[in-house]
Protein backbone atom coordinates (compact mmCIF):
# COMPACT_ATOMS: atom_id res chain seq x y z
CA UNK A 1 0.00 0.00 0.00
CA UNK A 2 1.67 3.23 -1.16
CA UNK A 3 2.04 5.88 1.53
CA UNK A 4 0.02 9.05 0.85
CA UNK A 5 2.47 11.06 2.98
CA UNK A 6 5.62 10.90 0.87
CA UNK A 7 5.29 14.51 -0.38
CA UNK A 8 4.89 15.82 3.18
CA UNK A 9 7.89 13.83 4.39
CA UNK A 10 9.88 15.07 1.42
CA UNK A 11 9.02 18.69 2.16
CA UNK A 12 9.99 18.33 5.84
CA UNK A 13 13.29 16.65 4.90
CA UNK A 14 13.97 19.43 2.38
CA UNK A 15 13.42 22.15 5.00
CA UNK A 16 15.73 20.36 7.46
CA UNK A 17 18.47 20.13 4.83
CA UNK A 18 18.03 23.81 3.95
CA UNK A 19 18.23 24.85 7.59
CA UNK A 20 21.36 22.76 8.08
CA UNK A 21 23.06 24.07 4.94
CA UNK A 22 22.21 27.77 5.34
CA UNK A 23 21.96 28.15 9.10
CA UNK A 24 18.51 29.75 8.74
CA UNK A 25 16.12 28.99 11.61
CA UNK A 26 13.21 27.06 10.06
CA UNK A 27 12.21 25.26 13.26
CA UNK A 28 8.74 26.87 13.41
CA UNK A 29 7.90 25.94 9.81
CA UNK A 30 9.17 22.38 10.30
CA UNK A 31 7.17 21.95 13.52
CA UNK A 32 4.01 23.26 11.82
CA UNK A 33 4.39 20.81 8.93
CA UNK A 34 5.07 17.92 11.32
CA UNK A 35 1.92 18.75 13.32
CA UNK A 36 -0.17 18.89 10.14
CA UNK A 37 1.33 15.61 8.96
CA UNK A 38 0.56 13.95 12.30
CA UNK A 39 -3.09 15.06 12.08
CA UNK A 40 -3.33 13.89 8.47
CA UNK A 41 -1.85 10.48 9.33
CA UNK A 42 -4.27 10.04 12.24
CA UNK A 43 -7.30 10.98 10.13
CA UNK A 44 -6.18 8.78 7.25
CA UNK A 45 -5.55 5.62 9.29
CA UNK A 46 -8.76 6.05 11.28
CA UNK A 47 -10.81 6.17 8.06
CA UNK A 48 -9.30 3.45 5.89
CA UNK A 49 -11.65 1.62 3.54
CA UNK A 50 -12.14 -2.15 3.98
CA UNK A 51 -10.05 -2.77 0.86
CA UNK A 52 -7.21 -0.63 2.19
CA UNK A 53 -7.25 -2.67 5.41
CA UNK A 54 -7.08 -5.88 3.36
CA UNK A 55 -3.96 -4.50 1.70
CA UNK A 56 -2.44 -3.63 5.08
CA UNK A 57 -3.21 -7.16 6.32
CA UNK A 58 -1.08 -8.48 3.44
CA UNK A 59 1.79 -6.03 3.90
CA UNK A 60 5.26 -7.61 4.01
CA UNK A 61 6.82 -7.27 7.42
CA UNK A 62 3.70 -7.89 9.50
CA UNK A 63 4.37 -10.13 12.52
CA UNK A 64 4.09 -13.82 11.68
CA UNK A 65 3.32 -16.67 14.06
CA UNK A 66 7.03 -17.42 14.50
CA UNK A 67 7.76 -13.73 15.19
CA UNK A 68 5.15 -13.72 17.96
CA UNK A 69 6.45 -16.99 19.39
CA UNK A 70 10.01 -15.67 19.41
CA UNK A 71 9.27 -12.32 21.08
CA UNK A 72 6.19 -12.88 23.25
CA UNK A 73 6.77 -16.46 24.45
CA UNK A 74 9.64 -18.27 26.13
CA UNK A 75 11.32 -21.62 25.39
CA UNK A 76 9.25 -22.47 22.30
CA UNK A 77 9.82 -26.05 21.14
CA UNK A 78 8.44 -26.74 17.67
CA UNK A 79 6.85 -30.13 17.02
CA UNK A 80 6.78 -31.46 13.47
CA UNK A 81 4.65 -33.84 11.45
CA UNK A 82 1.14 -35.27 11.50
CA UNK A 83 2.21 -38.88 12.21
CA UNK A 84 0.48 -39.95 8.99
CA UNK A 85 1.91 -38.29 5.88
CA UNK A 86 4.30 -35.33 6.23
CA UNK A 87 5.20 -32.12 8.00
CA UNK A 88 3.43 -29.06 6.59
CA UNK A 89 5.54 -25.89 7.01
CA UNK A 90 2.43 -23.73 6.38
CA UNK A 91 1.38 -24.56 9.95
CA UNK A 92 3.78 -24.38 12.87
CA UNK A 93 3.16 -25.39 16.46
CA UNK A 94 4.56 -26.77 19.65
CA UNK A 95 5.06 -26.13 23.35
CA UNK A 96 6.00 -22.83 24.97
CA UNK A 97 5.76 -20.71 28.09
CA UNK A 98 3.74 -17.49 28.27
CA UNK A 99 4.76 -15.53 31.35
CA UNK A 100 5.64 -18.77 33.13
CA UNK A 101 2.51 -20.68 32.11
CA UNK A 102 2.84 -23.77 29.91
CA UNK A 103 0.82 -23.48 26.69
CA UNK A 104 0.39 -25.27 23.37
CA UNK A 105 0.57 -23.01 20.31
CA UNK A 106 -0.41 -23.46 16.66
CA UNK A 107 -0.45 -20.97 13.80
CA UNK A 108 -0.33 -20.41 10.07
CA UNK A 109 3.10 -19.37 8.85
CA UNK A 110 3.74 -17.32 5.72
CA UNK A 111 7.22 -16.69 4.38
CA UNK A 112 9.18 -13.50 4.93
CA UNK A 113 10.48 -13.50 1.35
CA UNK A 114 9.69 -15.20 -1.97
CA UNK A 115 11.85 -18.25 -1.30
CA UNK A 116 10.32 -18.87 2.12
CA UNK A 117 6.80 -18.18 0.82
CA UNK A 118 7.27 -20.93 -1.75
CA UNK A 119 8.53 -23.26 0.97
CA UNK A 120 5.56 -22.45 3.21
CA UNK A 121 3.05 -22.40 0.34
CA UNK A 122 2.13 -18.77 1.12
CA UNK A 123 0.56 -19.87 4.40
CA UNK A 124 -1.98 -22.18 2.71
CA UNK A 125 -2.00 -25.49 4.61
CA UNK A 126 -2.41 -28.99 3.20
CA UNK A 127 -4.40 -31.65 5.10
CA UNK A 128 -1.27 -32.76 6.95
CA UNK A 129 -1.01 -29.26 8.42
CA UNK A 130 -4.44 -29.53 9.99
CA UNK A 131 -3.72 -33.06 11.19
CA UNK A 132 -0.61 -31.65 12.90
CA UNK A 133 -2.81 -28.99 14.51
CA UNK A 134 -5.21 -31.68 15.77
CA UNK A 135 -2.29 -33.64 17.17
CA UNK A 136 -1.37 -30.55 19.20
CA UNK A 137 -4.99 -30.06 20.28
CA UNK A 138 -4.91 -33.58 21.71
CA UNK A 139 -1.65 -32.75 23.48
CA UNK A 140 -3.16 -29.63 25.07
CA UNK A 141 -6.20 -31.58 26.24
CA UNK A 142 -4.12 -34.44 27.64
CA UNK A 143 -1.91 -32.19 29.77
CA UNK A 144 -4.45 -29.46 30.53
CA UNK A 145 -2.47 -26.67 28.85
CA UNK A 146 -4.19 -23.60 27.31
CA UNK A 147 -4.38 -23.84 23.52
CA UNK A 148 -3.43 -20.69 21.58
CA UNK A 149 -3.70 -20.24 17.82
CA UNK A 150 -2.59 -17.58 15.35
CA UNK A 151 -4.44 -17.17 12.07
CA UNK A 152 -2.85 -15.71 8.93
CA UNK A 153 -3.88 -17.49 5.74
CA UNK A 154 -5.64 -16.62 2.48
CA UNK A 155 -7.25 -20.07 2.86
CA UNK A 156 -6.50 -23.76 2.87
CA UNK A 157 -4.59 -24.94 -0.20
CA UNK A 158 -7.15 -25.73 -2.96
CA UNK A 159 -4.86 -27.84 -5.17
CA UNK A 160 -5.57 -31.32 -6.51
CA UNK A 161 -3.05 -32.96 -4.17
CA UNK A 162 -4.77 -31.46 -1.12
CA UNK A 163 -8.22 -32.49 -2.33
CA UNK A 164 -6.99 -36.02 -3.00
CA UNK A 165 -5.85 -36.23 0.62
CA UNK A 166 -9.22 -35.09 1.97
CA UNK A 167 -8.81 -31.36 2.55
CA UNK A 168 -12.49 -30.61 3.26
CA UNK A 169 -12.86 -33.62 5.56
CA UNK A 170 -9.74 -32.75 7.54
CA UNK A 171 -10.88 -29.12 7.99
CA UNK A 172 -14.23 -30.37 9.29
CA UNK A 173 -12.43 -32.73 11.68
CA UNK A 174 -10.23 -29.90 12.94
CA UNK A 175 -13.25 -27.66 13.58
CA UNK A 176 -14.95 -30.49 15.46
CA UNK A 177 -11.86 -31.36 17.47
CA UNK A 178 -11.14 -27.78 18.55
CA UNK A 179 -14.78 -27.21 19.50
CA UNK A 180 -14.49 -30.08 22.00
CA UNK A 181 -11.38 -28.88 23.81
CA UNK A 182 -11.60 -28.95 27.61
CA UNK A 183 -8.91 -26.31 28.08
CA UNK A 184 -8.92 -22.53 27.52
CA UNK A 185 -8.61 -21.73 23.80
CA UNK A 186 -7.72 -18.30 22.43
CA UNK A 187 -7.24 -17.31 18.78
CA UNK A 188 -5.52 -14.21 17.40
CA UNK A 189 -6.11 -13.24 13.76
CA UNK A 190 -2.79 -11.69 12.74
CA UNK A 191 -3.42 -10.78 9.10
CA UNK A 192 -5.61 -12.72 6.70
CA UNK A 193 -8.39 -14.99 7.91
CA UNK A 194 -9.59 -16.76 4.80
CA UNK A 195 -12.55 -19.14 4.94
CA UNK A 196 -12.45 -22.66 6.41
CA UNK A 197 -8.68 -22.67 6.28
CA UNK A 198 -8.76 -20.04 9.03
CA UNK A 199 -11.77 -21.37 10.95
CA UNK A 200 -10.15 -24.81 11.27
CA UNK A 201 -7.90 -23.44 14.04
CA UNK A 202 -10.14 -20.62 15.29
CA UNK A 203 -12.93 -22.36 17.24
CA UNK A 204 -11.85 -20.69 20.47
CA UNK A 205 -13.38 -19.33 23.65
CA UNK A 206 -11.99 -15.91 22.76
CA UNK A 207 -11.21 -14.69 19.24
CA UNK A 208 -9.02 -11.59 18.99
CA UNK A 209 -8.15 -9.70 15.81
CA UNK A 210 -5.48 -7.17 14.92
CA UNK A 211 -6.85 -3.77 13.96
CA UNK A 212 -6.09 -4.12 10.23
CA UNK A 213 -6.61 -7.87 9.85
CA UNK A 214 -9.59 -9.40 8.05
CA UNK A 215 -11.68 -12.54 8.56
CA UNK A 216 -14.25 -13.78 6.06
CA UNK A 217 -15.81 -16.76 4.33
CA UNK A 218 -14.05 -15.75 1.11
CA UNK A 219 -11.37 -13.34 -0.10
CA UNK A 220 -12.58 -10.09 -1.71
CA UNK A 221 -11.06 -11.07 -5.07
CA UNK A 222 -12.79 -14.45 -5.16
CA UNK A 223 -16.08 -12.92 -4.05
CA UNK A 224 -15.84 -10.27 -6.77
CA UNK A 225 -15.05 -12.90 -9.40
CA UNK A 226 -18.18 -14.84 -8.43
CA UNK A 227 -20.67 -12.00 -7.91
CA UNK A 228 -19.46 -9.44 -10.44
CA UNK A 229 -17.48 -11.73 -12.77
CA UNK A 230 -14.52 -9.41 -12.30
CA UNK A 231 -11.80 -9.62 -9.63
CA UNK A 232 -11.21 -5.88 -10.09
CA UNK A 233 -14.41 -5.33 -8.12
CA UNK A 234 -12.60 -6.55 -4.99
CA UNK A 235 -12.93 -3.17 -3.20
CA UNK A 236 -16.72 -3.39 -3.58
CA UNK A 237 -16.67 -6.98 -2.34
CA UNK A 238 -14.54 -6.04 0.67
CA UNK A 239 -17.15 -3.46 1.64
CA UNK A 240 -20.02 -5.93 1.27
CA UNK A 241 -18.36 -8.78 3.16
CA UNK A 242 -18.07 -6.85 6.45
CA UNK A 243 -14.65 -8.38 7.00
CA UNK A 244 -12.87 -5.65 8.96
CA UNK A 245 -12.08 -5.84 12.67
CA UNK A 246 -14.62 -3.13 13.47
CA UNK A 247 -17.40 -4.88 11.53
CA UNK A 248 -16.56 -8.26 13.06
CA UNK A 249 -16.62 -6.87 16.60
CA UNK A 250 -20.01 -5.30 15.93
CA UNK A 251 -21.29 -8.64 14.61
CA UNK A 252 -19.76 -10.42 17.65
CA UNK A 253 -17.68 -12.68 15.41
CA UNK A 254 -14.62 -11.51 17.36
CA UNK A 255 -14.37 -10.56 21.02
CA UNK A 256 -11.72 -7.83 20.98
CA UNK A 257 -9.57 -5.75 18.64
CA UNK A 258 -5.82 -5.61 19.23
CA UNK A 259 -4.55 -2.11 18.34
CA UNK A 260 -1.76 -1.74 15.79
CA UNK A 261 0.92 0.95 15.58
CA UNK A 262 0.03 3.86 13.33
CA UNK A 263 0.40 2.80 9.71
CA UNK A 264 0.00 -0.91 10.44
CA UNK A 265 1.70 -3.69 12.38
CA UNK A 266 4.51 -3.88 9.81
CA UNK A 267 5.63 -0.35 10.77
CA UNK A 268 6.53 -1.41 14.31
CA UNK A 269 6.30 -5.22 14.67
CA UNK A 270 7.76 -5.24 18.19
CA UNK A 271 5.08 -2.90 19.48
CA UNK A 272 2.38 -4.91 17.71
CA UNK A 273 3.67 -8.10 19.35
CA UNK A 274 3.61 -6.45 22.78
CA UNK A 275 -0.04 -5.55 22.17
CA UNK A 276 -0.78 -9.14 21.13
CA UNK A 277 0.85 -10.49 24.28
CA UNK A 278 -1.16 -8.14 26.51
CA UNK A 279 -4.41 -9.15 24.79
CA UNK A 280 -3.59 -12.85 25.14
CA UNK A 281 -2.84 -12.54 28.84
CA UNK A 282 -6.08 -10.64 29.40
CA UNK A 283 -8.11 -13.27 27.54
CA UNK A 284 -6.49 -16.12 29.47
CA UNK A 285 -7.15 -14.34 32.75
CA UNK A 286 -10.86 -14.16 31.85
CA UNK A 287 -10.93 -17.93 31.30
CA UNK A 288 -8.86 -18.84 34.34
CA UNK A 289 -10.76 -20.82 36.93
CA UNK A 290 -13.41 -22.18 34.55
CA UNK A 291 -13.88 -25.93 34.73
CA UNK A 292 -13.36 -28.10 31.62
CA UNK A 293 -17.14 -28.43 31.29
CA UNK A 294 -17.63 -24.66 31.64
CA UNK A 295 -14.99 -23.97 28.97
CA UNK A 296 -16.71 -26.37 26.60
CA UNK A 297 -20.12 -24.79 27.27
CA UNK A 298 -18.69 -21.27 26.91
CA UNK A 299 -17.28 -22.12 23.49
CA UNK A 300 -20.51 -23.84 22.42
CA UNK A 301 -22.65 -20.85 23.41
CA UNK A 302 -20.28 -18.43 21.70
CA UNK A 303 -20.55 -20.07 18.30
CA UNK A 304 -24.25 -20.96 18.57
CA UNK A 305 -25.03 -17.28 19.16
CA UNK A 306 -23.41 -16.14 15.89
CA UNK A 307 -26.01 -14.95 13.41
CA UNK A 308 -28.81 -14.93 15.97
CA UNK A 309 -31.40 -12.22 15.48
CA UNK A 310 -34.78 -11.17 16.85
CA UNK A 311 -37.90 -10.70 14.74
CA UNK A 312 -39.00 -7.02 14.66
Swiss-Prot record:
Catalysed transformations (reactions): N(6)-carboxybiotinyl-L-lysyl-[protein] + acetyl-CoA = N(6)-biotinyl-L-lysyl-[protein] + malonyl-CoA
PROSITE patterns named in the record: COA_CT_CTER
GO cellular component: acetyl-CoA carboxylase complex
Keyword list, A-Z: ATP-binding, Cytoplasm, Fatty acid biosynthesis, Fatty acid metabolism, Lipid biosynthesis, Lipid metabolism, Nucleotide-binding, Transferase
Enzyme class: transferase
Domain CoA carboxyltransferase C-terminal: 32-286
Pathway assigned to this chain's UniProt record: Lipid metabolism; malonyl-CoA biosynthesis; malonyl-CoA from acetyl-CoA: step 1/1
Subcellular location: Cytoplasm
UniProt GO MF annotations: acetyl-CoA carboxylase activity; ATP binding; carboxyl- or carbamoyltransferase activity
A Gene Ontology biological process term: fatty acid biosynthetic process
InterPro entries in UniProt: Acetyl_CoA_COase_a_su, ClpP/crotonase-like_dom_sf, COA_CT_C
Any one Pfam family match given in the protein's UniProt record, by short name: ACCA
Role: Component of the acetyl coenzyme A carboxylase (ACC) complex. First, biotin carboxylase catalyzes the carboxylation of biotin on its carrier protein (BCCP) and then the CO(2) group is transferred by the carboxyltransferase to acetyl-CoA to form malonyl-CoA.
HAMAP family: AcetylCoA_CT_alpha
E.C. designation(s): 2.1.3.15
Stated name of the protein: Acetyl-coenzyme A carboxylase carboxyl transferase subunit alpha
Known partners and oligomeric status: Acetyl-CoA carboxylase is a heterohexamer composed of biotin carboxyl carrier protein (AccB), biotin carboxylase (AccC) and two subunits each of ACCase subunit alpha (AccA) and ACCase subunit beta (AccD).
Family: Belongs to the AccA family.
NCBIfam families: accA (TIGR00513), AccA_sub (NF041504), PRK05724.1 (NF004344)
Amino acid sequence: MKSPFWSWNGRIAELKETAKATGVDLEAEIRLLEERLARLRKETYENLTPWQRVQLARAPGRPTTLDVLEKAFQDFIELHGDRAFADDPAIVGGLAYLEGEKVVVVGHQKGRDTKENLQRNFGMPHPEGYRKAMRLMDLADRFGYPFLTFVDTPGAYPGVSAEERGQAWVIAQSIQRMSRLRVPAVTVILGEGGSGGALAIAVANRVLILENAWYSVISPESCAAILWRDAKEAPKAAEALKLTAKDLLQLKVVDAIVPEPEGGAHKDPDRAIRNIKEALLKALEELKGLSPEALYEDRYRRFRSLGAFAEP
